[in-house]
Amino acid sequence: PPVPATPESKQQSPNNSACLTKRVNTFLQTHYDFRYNRLTEETEFRPLSGTKTEFRPIGKRELNTLCMEAHAEGISCWDKDVSRYIYSTQIGEYHPFRLYMDELPPWDGIDRLTPLARRVSALPLWVKGFHTWMLGLAAQWEGKTGVHANSLAPILISAEQGRMKSTFCKSLMPKVLQRYYMDNLKLTSEGQAERLLSEMGLINLDEFDKYAESKMPLLKNLMQMSSLHVCKAYQRNFRDLPRIASFIGTSNRSDLMSDPTGSRRFFCVEVEKPINCEGIEHEQIFAQLKAELADGCPYWFDKETEHEIQQNNAPFYRTCPAEEVFLSCFRTTASVEEKYLRLSAADIYKELKKRNAAALRGFNPNHFAQVLIKMGVERKHTEYGNVYLVVRR
């Protein structure tokens, strides 16, 4: 009986093996365009016959298809012969965000950042702050952040549904980078969150109010990171990777901020009407950002602007019962005719406890001192300890 044919790679001489490798490589190179994605660590491909076709990752199904197509061309090979080339350093590598920024057309000189910001709000501080935030986002995509991470997150707020907040956040991403947008960040693992900072371009903290207060220190720490020490999935070794992702957020609640000193990491803006998310000219918007970064425009917030943002966030603070009792009994500003009382935290605590003991449940004088500091009550240090300047109502 006839002996069944076997692939050429089975039990062959070194010369035949080299010949097969050459035939397989030539077939792949003449039919497909390949590239290695440094972010996802995947090889991507598209047919050479249609360069407009988008690249897509090679999985097991695609690998088997390539092997079958080689068989149809008379090349008797195994899938390992195909994968040997596909997963080799002969495939050129690229970084999706660097490539996007490198291939942008020249900026035409028309400011598109201001109209884009005004789609959300015409508040001057917002227009200015959104522009700086977008510069920070673009700087991280270009890998130019240095010591300045994009450590602020705009939070789009509206009590009513249907204002297109989440849609606007997603529409900031160019189409070719949409896969690097996410809106379901889980703050359960710091290592996992750090890995996402090195792989995503924009992370939407959608429904920002769902994140527990206990998670805020972790989130703020992530937002300040400019470089990352990451161990990727299925790997044992940690690597230092640049941060790519910036943060943005949405909420239907206005009582979001609980810590005025930490609120400089967020920029709350009220969305008063549905946001127009159509016709965003991504190429020219990012070309403008690229040109401004090249001209040395600052992509971080200075102390003065951070202070303005904290003042802007004041209406979005969430007050605890202890703060409410304090404000019902004392003021922190005095008129010309009035004099400040100089009271210790213990003195104020005792007086408030007489007024409303339930509101101070769980507090002691030391804990209450932290509340006064958080509220920004002016403090003076004396030889007898700290006193707070207040006016009794």
Model-derived segments and spans:
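AAA+/SF3 P-loop NTPase mechanochemical coupling elements
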Residues: 193-198, 232-250
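N-terminal nucleic-acid engagement/recognition segments and initiation subdomains in replication
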Residues: 1-110, 121-128, 354, 358-359, ...
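A short helix-turn-beta junction within AAA+ P-loop NTPase domains corresponding to the substrate/partner-engaging
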Residues: 257-276
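Conserved AAA+/SF3 P-loop NTPase catalytic/coupling segment centered on the Walker-B
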Residues: 200-223, 257-262
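Conserved catalytic/switch belt of AAA+ P-loop NTPases
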Residues: 216-239
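Long, low-complexity, charged/polar intrinsically disordered regions in eukaryotic proteins
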Residues: 278-313
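P-loop NTPase catalytic core of nucleic-acid-dependent motor ATPases
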Residues: 86-198
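DNA transaction DNA-binding modules
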Residues: 300-393
